[in-house]
């Protein structure tokens, strides 16, 4: 399971001209599901995302996690993160989870984060989305479990 996280000062997702998810300070999470992923991996990754210290403390050091910084999550499904780009000029998605598996784990990820008290907004699974953000830093990390 893969989470590309970006520290943002604002981010939103638009589908068919309507904003469906929007946050101010927090993390934009692009979430990719691979074939071997399961609930245990999802919980481990969600915990890591929420606990990862990417926000600045009073000394300007990346020392605060999402809760300590008072941030929110915007979680967007992104199957292209599971692409194999090692050969040729076209990505292979053979390692990506099935649509049903990906939907189940994406929804479980969102529910898990909400259950921990984190303000969690979402995109729309399998939709054509327009994602806009202001990357604060920029700060971007690729987390995998």
Curated annotation (Swiss-Prot):
It comes from the Bacteria. This is D-aminoacyl-tRNA deacylase. It holds the Pfam family Tyr_Deacylase. Keywords: Cytoplasm, Hydrolase, RNA-binding, tRNA-binding. One of its GO terms (biological process) is D-amino acid catabolic process. Its EC number is 3.1.1.96. InterPro entries: Daa-tRNA_deacyls_DTD (IPR003732), DTD-like_sf (IPR023509). It is an enzyme of class 3 (hydrolase).
